[in-house]
């Protein structure tokens, strides 16, 4: 067995769930929704992804969670820390 293939269980960096625009209610526990618009897909952990019928499709995740995912932008730019 000389084949080394990545299993699909292992999330790659790009498929990690993330959200830049997250809105939460003030209830306990909070009800949070990611309002990011993505093209053709939602983040990897999204259970209820709603897309427009346009091309490319604009998709938003309709899940309600009690937390927000990491922001998508932060992983790529470290420039924000230098201010």
UniProtKB/Swiss-Prot annotation:
Membrane-spanning segments: none
Cysteine disulfide links: 18-72, 19-34, 22-68, 24-32, 42-49, 46-61, 51-59
Pfam family, one: Bowman-Birk_leg
Molecular functions (GO terms): serine-type endopeptidase inhibitor activity
This protein's UniProt keywords: Disulfide bond, Protease inhibitor, Serine protease inhibitor
A cellular component annotation (GO) from this entry: extracellular region
InterPro entries: Bowman-Birk_prot_inh (IPR035995), Prot_inh_BBI (IPR000877)
Reactive bond for chymotrypsin (site feature) positions: 53-54
CDD domains named in the record: BBI
SUPFAM superfamilies xrefs: Bowman-Birk inhibitor, BBI
Site (Reactive bond for trypsin): 26-27
Gene3D superfamilies associated with the record: Cysteine Protease (Bromelain) Inhibitor, subunit H
Family in the record: Belongs to the Bowman-Birk serine protease inhibitor family.
Note: Several variants were isolated from a commercial Lima bean preparation. Some lacked 8, 12, or 14 N-terminal residues and 2 C-terminal residues.
Name of the molecule in the record: Bowman-Birk type proteinase inhibitor
Phylogenetic lineage: Eukaryota, Viridiplantae, Streptophyta, Embryophyta, Tracheophyta
């Amino acid at each position: 067995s000389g084949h080394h293939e990545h299993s699909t269980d292992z999330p790659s960096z790009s498929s990690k769930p993330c959200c830049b625009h997250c809105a939460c209610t003030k209830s306990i526990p909070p009800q949070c929704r990611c309002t990011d618009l993505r093209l053709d897909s939602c983040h990897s952990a999204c259970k209820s992804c709603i897309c427009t019928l346009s091309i490319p499709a604009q998709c938003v995740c309709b899940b309600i969670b009690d937390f927000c995912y990491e922001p998508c932008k932060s992983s790529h730019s470290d420039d924000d820390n230098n201010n």
